[in-house]
């Protein structure tokens, strides 16, 4: 069953939310207007805008925003002629008043994210969002860390709370092909007509587009990506590449492939501080199963304490750290510095 009469699937571009991690949360109103204008003209139906860690994320722990996110949401709403504006929030980091303010500023889609075993903390937030007339989307983050049957049960909690689409979220970019299909299929079977299923991928193992196509084949009706992979880690599924592939496969997204390719090169690329690429650290995140937004933090701590960023990430993966535990990366870096090269995480892994 297609997403709608006009679209087989709906694509959400996360460049102005997930890309905030790569930009170190330094987006300006001018950046938002430029990117939203280009994506809107290319036919992208939904554009997500907030701090990388969602509403209320501007903080010492996560990184301070250059411009208050509510101002960015306002600018996005004012600029978009067709696209709808979405926002992300993590319960406990963002609060209910943040949702109300985002709705007042014109955003119409509320995306609520929890760790994939903690869907219960989203219940009251979904209730509020539905009361406000917002469309609701749920994120089961770090979905690689749990088997399909566990994710399906967590998805049921979100759907029963009023969530209209539950996403398998590959926060670490660690899922490989059939692992995506199995998880999406499990959610589709559990939710039936009660809620749609979506997929959010990262490029940390170079599989963003392939995984997203497999998610669609397994029944996902909503897919996330970022233009020119503008996101955490190695970035998200590149919207321009996904648009080209889906066009060749006859999957209707409503996105003009040539226009989104131009937007990626002419508008988004100049705003990026550098390309989001598959390098040593981002590859290590997918390999070790580490939350993608840890990339900049691990790199900074590695430089500060004179240790290997890859070793920091391997240890973070061993500890199974999740979003919100960024402070432990400092502890890991200090431990590596104290132990020296002979006691490094890589050395221990090789000798095991």
Swiss-Prot record:
GO terms for biological process: catabolic process; L-leucine biosynthetic process. Keywords: Aromatic hydrocarbons catabolism, Lyase, Manganese, Metal-binding. Its EC number is 4.1.3.39. It catalyses: (S)-4-hydroxy-2-oxopentanoate = acetaldehyde + pyruvate. Residues 9-261 form the Pyruvate carboxyltransferase domain. It comes from the Bacteria. GO terms for molecular function: 2-isopropylmalate synthase activity; 4-hydroxy-2-oxovalerate aldolase activity; manganese ion binding. The keyword Cytoplasm does not apply. This is 4-hydroxy-2-oxovalerate aldolase 4.
